Amino acid sequence: GFGFEKKEYYEQMVRRNAKRMNQANNWIVFVRGNHDNPAYFEGTTFSYKRFIAVPDYTILQACNHSILCVGGAISIDRIYRINEWNKRKYRVHSNELQENDISRNLYWKNEAPAYDADKMNTICVDFLIDTVVTHTAPSHCELFSKSNLNQWAENDSLLLGDVQLEREVMDMLLHHLKINNHPVSHWYYGHFHQSWHSDIDGILYQMLDIMEFSQVY
């Protein structure tokens, strides 16, 4: 994730791959996951010719598609991540000049997706969305329960409610698109590290596994 390493690590990734991306005329757009520092996704911190980490509610227009991007999800192991970081943060940060918004970490408290009605209203004025890319998914999509969720919840009293709210945010996003007559036909997401797809009420929902690719026609 963006934030597990120093910023220089991600800059080196760009330098290593820039030539072949230019030759292939390809771009990589990163949508925020729960293991990413949101500070990288404000539009300028990680923005290069062929690589960009985009803010939530970004609209991509490519190949005759208008694509809405909204990141974020809940880490069910967040208590472990917080405790683990507390053990190692002094050693890590003692080797850095100073802490800042993009200092390394294992968990970010603002990881969850957020529903922004104002941004959606603005989008509706200028765009007709046909494709949605998110990290998590609406509540009617798999997975309905992540493995070991209840075990993690034993030591995290707010976890089950936060996970439910995460999916409700996606439901609100979908509802806003529907009532404003957006021609949504595809919805892509990840988060659950499995592969699944289903056509539900005219929308093809596709959960992508790690390193799984899907072509949008």
Predicted stretch roles:
Residues 1-3, 34-37, 73-74, 137-139, ...:
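Catalytic metal-binding/acid-base residues of hydrolase active sites
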Residues 31-33, 70, 208:
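Generic beta-sheet signal
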Residues 57-58, 71-76, 211:
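A short, sequence-level motif marking secondary-structure junctions
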Residues 61-63, 171-180, 192-217:
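Binuclear metal-dependent phosphoesterase catalytic core
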